Regions:
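Kelch-like beta-propeller repeat domains
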Residues: 1-221
């Protein structure tokens, strides 16, 4: 399941359970209400995609249909007055991937670092405007596949954690990567969010207890 936020509403798309690969869209608002409007349903079921909002449109990138990883970029215009639009394939991403990250800063979209074929980590790219042209960003040889990342506005950096439990910083001003802390455990999935300058990391695993930690970039120099 992937998620994105637009005008105080969270959009949750696709996902998988034991039997079904989902195509539905669930919407959560600040009144603590859930809805599932059918007009937002995806053209086909997918899981492991990433979603984001860019210029009043909702996007879904990549994911898997259960047989193959995808590279489609789907767009739904959220600015429609009546709320009824459609999903359109607007571009192809440079890699077929599942997982990975998408981060929007200003007019640019940064995406990639998901899991490609045979579990190999995909690259990292940036784009803008129509999202049809993606420019590659060099990445460290040792970085693994990434499932979550955050933007630190004060440092103008992305912080992300790979599937080895390694935290990485990518500074947008200098274009430099810095290897940060290595967590003392590996988990199947990581989720990150940032609040008041502190990064919170939830590690999830099928066989071990979940881990929840606080990470302050200022400490990690």
């Amino acid at each position: 399941m992937s998620a994105a936020v637009y005008k105080n509403q969270a959009y949750l798309l696709g996902g998988i359970d034991k039997q079904t690969i989902g195509a539905n869209c669930q919407i959560y608002n600040l009144d603590n209400n859930w809805s599932e409007p059918t007009q937002y349903s995806l053209p086909g079921g997918r899981f492991g995609a990433v979603s984001f909002v860019y210029r009043d449109s909702l996007y879904v990138l990549g994911g898997s249909d259960g047989s193959n990883n995808m590279n489609e970029i789907l767009r739904y215009d959220l600015s429609s007055q009546d709320g009824y639009g459609s999903w359109d394939v607007i571009a192809e991403f440079p890699a077929h991937q599942r997982g990975g990250i998408v981060l929007v800063v200003g007019n640019k979209v940064y995406a990639g670092l998901g899991e490609g074929g045979n579990g190999i980590r995909s690259g990292f790219w940036e784009s803008s405007d129509s999202l049809k042209i993606w420019n590659p960003i060099s990445i460290p040889d040792k970085i693994g596949s990434v499932s979550s990342g955050v933007y630190d506005e004060q440092r103008n950096s992305f912080f992300m954690i790979d599937n080895n439990g390694k935290i990485w910083e990518y500074n947008l001003s200098s274009g430099e990567w810095t290897a940060r802390s290595l967590l003392g455990y590996r988990m199947n999935n990581y989720h990150m969010f940032m609040l008041n300058g502190i990064i919170y990391i939830l590690g999830q695993d099928l066989y071990y207890a979940n881990k929840f930690i606080m990470y302050n970039p200022i400490w990690d120099n």
